[in-house]
């Protein structure tokens, strides 16, 4: 069965030749994995910002999804390792993986996500997942501090005539540098992109997490990602209540500093 590439994913060709090359290879790659793993297509192709997601049935007729991720996305390189480490505890279950081809076979979840809930209720759900996700980091993972160091270098190169007060740039740079050298900034495996759209309803548990951008970091940064991604602007009271909800459920924080947001959205 020919694999169709959703137009919105195919539009990523505009990001350069690496993207275009991967998209050219993608239909054949998908067809090869489907055949080799004995899968049967079972619905319309879906996509995230950097992945193709195909609903399939396994050889045992179990519903699943085949996820094929852009091979130039370093943030998702160790997604399979992280899912294997979590072992389905609070997260989508990994059924099979081919890291070389960035192919993951995952249990199929529902399409409803936390965006359908009241903000505080959604943050309570996410907060309840923190203690299950925040485990000792795998040695293969990139560190959050490596990303922050790179972002800080970019910030320092900002021209002095940029439309932002220089003192704010200098303050942000100083805070980032202190974050990078703090030992508490690494050592815990964090999801890296834990927001409403990355928590889907399921049968095995009420809610399960998808699409990690795993890294070794500080678990307190997860709260910033959750409370900073709500889809629409929140009233101050709602934002504060949500932050309180996620904090009460999270693992004991290593610090109370303000940390940078991490990652970017990518469904599934």
Language-model features, listed with the residues they occupy:
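A conserved alpha-helical element in kinase catalytic cores
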Residues: 27, 60-105, 110-133
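Active-site Asp-x-Gly
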Residues: 201-247, 251-254
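An alpha-helical support segment within catalytic cores of ATP-dependent transferases
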Residues: 22-32, 138-192, 202-203, 251
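Active-site acidic catalytic loop and adjacent metal/ATP-binding pocket
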Residues: 46, 50-58, 65-66, 94, ...
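A cross-family kinase active-site recognition segment
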Residues: 1-4, 8, 112-170, 187, ...
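Conserved NTP-binding catalytic cores of kinases and kinase-like/nucleotidyltransferase enzymes
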Residues: 1-91, 202-206
């Amino acid at each position: 069965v020919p694999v169709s590439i959703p137009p919105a994913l195919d539009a990523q060709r505009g990001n350069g030749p690496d993207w275009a090359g991967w998209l050219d290879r993608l239909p054949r790659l998908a067809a090869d994995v489907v055949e080799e793993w004995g899968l049967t297509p079972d619905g319309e192709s879906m996509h995230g910002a950097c992945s193709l997601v195909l609903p399939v049935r396994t050889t045992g007729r179990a519903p699943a999804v085949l996820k094929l991720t852009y091979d130039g996305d370093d943030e998702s390189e160790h997604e399979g390792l992280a899912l294997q480490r979590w072992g389905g505890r609070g997260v989508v279950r990994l059924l099979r993986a081919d890291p070389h081809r960035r192919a993951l076979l995952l249990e199929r979840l529902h399409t409803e996500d936390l965006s359908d809930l009241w903000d505080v209720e959604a943050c309570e759900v996410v907060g309840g997942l923190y203690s299950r996700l925040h485990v000792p980091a795998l040695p293969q993972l990139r560190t959050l501090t490596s990303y922050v160091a790179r972002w800080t270098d970019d910030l320092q190169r900002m021209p002095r005539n940029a439309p932002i007060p220089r003192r704010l740039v200098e303050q942000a740079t100083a805070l980032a540098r202190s974050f990078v050298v703090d030992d508490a900034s690494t050592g815990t495996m964090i999801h890296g992109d834990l927001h409403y759209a990355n928590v889907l309803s399921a049968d095995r548990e009420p809610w399960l997490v998808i699409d990690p951008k795993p890294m070794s970091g500080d678990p307190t940064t997860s709260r910033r990602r959750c409370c900073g991604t709500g889809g629409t602007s929140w009233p101050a009271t709602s934002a504060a209540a949500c932050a309180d909800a996620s904090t009460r459920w999270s693992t004991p924080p290593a610090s109370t500093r303000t940390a940078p947001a991490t990652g970017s959205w990518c469904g599934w």
